[in-house]
């Protein structure tokens, strides 16, 4: 009996997961940009949504956020968690899915990691190692 073709594994999930995640990302970014969440903490911050990851069954969306300037991240996450029910309802209205995904918020730490690597690359020891050899022996 022939084996069924196994789809190639994608690092971020299937094409459908990636497509739905991007749609959810656009929806949540629009909601936050338009100031539709009436929370004093969120009204004082611009929040970026660089990534959303969907579970395989599309029932859970992990939304990575970063307040502009990188300050008060814990307060922003708490405010988003307090407004989770409203945000989930808004996502359900904007994204055409059988089930509205449950949502959870996480701080996107990629910016901090990139800054740490950039700082490391600028250290004198690394600069010395990266400099071209001028020794012609």
Swiss-Prot record:
Molecular function, one GO term: ribosomal small subunit binding
Major subcellular location class: cytoplasm
Coiled-coil positions: none
Domain of life (superkingdom): Bacteria
InterPro entries found in the cross-reference section: KH_dom-like_a/b, RbfA, RbfA_dom_sf, Ribosome-bd_factorA_CS
GO BP: any one term: maturation of SSU-rRNA
Gene Ontology CC entries for this record: cytosol
Function: One of several proteins that assist in the late maturation steps of the functional core of the 30S ribosomal subunit. Associates with free 30S ribosomal subunits (but not with 30S subunits that are part of 70S ribosomes or polysomes). Required for efficient processing of 16S rRNA. May interact with the 5'-terminal helix region of 16S rRNA.
Protein's name according to its UniProt entry: Ribosome-binding factor A
Organism: Nitrobacter winogradskyi (strain ATCC 25391 / DSM 10237 / CIP 104748 / NCIMB 11846 / Nb-255)
Gene field: rbfA
